[in-house]
Amino acid sequence: MTSISKRKNQQEHIPAEDLETPKLPKREKIEGTKESNKVRIIILLGYSGYGYHGIQINNPLKTIEGDVVAVLKKLGYLKTNNIDAEHLCIARAARTDKGVHTLRNLISLNLFVDKPLDISLLKTELNEALCSQIRVWSVFPAPKYFNPRISCESRTYEYLIPSFALLPPKPSCPLFKKMQKNLSRKLDNELERNLVYSMNDLISFWNTVKLKQKEIQEMFDTNKDAFTNPFKGMFYEKPIPAGIVIPPQAKLKKALKQAEYYCYMNYRIKEDRLKVLQQLLKKYEGRHNFHNFTVTDDSTSPSNYRFIESVTCGTPFVYENWEWIPVTIKGNSFMLNQIRKMMAHVLMIIRSCAPTGLIDKAFDPNITMNISKSPGHVLLLKDIKFSSYNDSVTDGLEKIQFDCFEEDILSLKIKTIYPDIIKLEQKEKLFFSFLSYIDQHTGHQFDYLFG
């Protein structure tokens, strides 16, 4: 597995899978090839997206399809020098962008060979030649005019929320001061009451942080020259160049900040708080106008409508002492930034005790909300479905299904993707930065939470 320290984090986007693909000009015949030498195939695969600028070829950037095509050329399955994306007719079931991970995706493309193709060997050859971030589950022939984007009926994503992201803001920050209006408002329904009551219980979290920081301060005051950070080695730290001496006050500052991280790390979400999250997420289900959750110039455009089949919270799990909440979102297709904004909107409502009706208001084409994007490194494409295609498969063609690869898929998830996601968060603290920006914001971007 490629070291996490060598992978540059990239923020992902999720373009709409149902947008029309631009029509390509008529392809010229490739020199030195015959139509009989062209074979169209389907590749089922999964991958960790770190270091990649998405799946789609976008030269000169490093992409998943770019690596696959390069390996196919090296293995002799593209017997020409002037092959390009147009002649490959390459397509995918779900277009993932920078940094997005995938357990189950599909690409389809043309091969150009000068001898009979033994497709049974291709999976093994690809896995041996590709980096360990990309794993091929299966390779088999495709119908001549197969379009995976259109044939794919649904896409399922998973978004990992760190439990500490549901904690209230610091009492000293601007967001906490603004949200006092929300805490004192009239509570119109049970969900509103549950939200506020769960918030009141969590205010004590910051007392725990203060006590921990007080212990650190007392240790420092006793003997500042001999002070040692009790959290040293517990959290990622940038290497200190040789010969550099860290002043005592700098050591104290770092220890006080890491005391806060320590409390975050040990926080475990309570059932009532988790229930509020699930009830709010359920409001996304159904067909809605998601104009506030993407980039659009026309809030009334029919293209803003999406059908969300389900949004569910999984059981929180602990990985290397940090607790995470998996949220699964299933829908037909998704627009640019849609899932990240959906998650951010819910987190903002919970953390500020805002009216729960703000989710419904966000669907109103006459209301504009400047919703932030939550971090993208925790987004994972879990599944794609081709039920109608599978029902219509004839002439000995294989169905598109992943059932017999579940063990390998689980291994990719547990051994590569999850560790990459979580270690990156620990190293870059992307959620900490996101929440800190919101908590310290003094402008008017988030005024819709307190109106």
Curated annotation (Swiss-Prot):
CDD domains for the chain: PseudoU_synth_PUS1_PUS2
Active site: D97 (nucleophile)
InterPro entries given in the database record: PsdUridine_synth_cat_dom_sf (IPR020103), PsdUridine_synth_TruA (IPR001406), PsdUridine_synth_TruA_a/b_dom (IPR020097), PsdUridine_synth_TruA_C (IPR020095), PUS1/PUS2-like (IPR041708), TruA/RsuA/RluB/E/F_N (IPR020094)
Ranges of biased composition (kind: Basic and acidic residues): 9-30
Binding site for substrate: Y157
Family matches, as SUPFAM superfamilies: Pseudouridine synthase
Co-factor note (free text): Binds 1 zinc ion per subunit.
Protein's GO biological process: mRNA pseudouridine synthesis; tRNA pseudouridine synthesis
Molecular function, one GO term: pseudouridine synthase activity
Domain of life: Eukaryota
Family the entry assigns: Belongs to the tRNA pseudouridine synthase TruA family.
Functional description taken from the UniProt entry: Formation of pseudouridine at positions 27 and 28 in the anticodon stem and loop of transfer RNAs; at positions 34 and 36 of intron-containing precursor tRNA(Ile) and at position 35 in the intron-containing tRNA(Tyr).
Protein name as it appears in the record: tRNA pseudouridine synthase 2
Organism of origin: Schizosaccharomyces pombe (strain 972 / ATCC 24843)
Biological classification of the source: Eukaryota, Fungi, Dikarya, Ascomycota, Taphrinomycotina
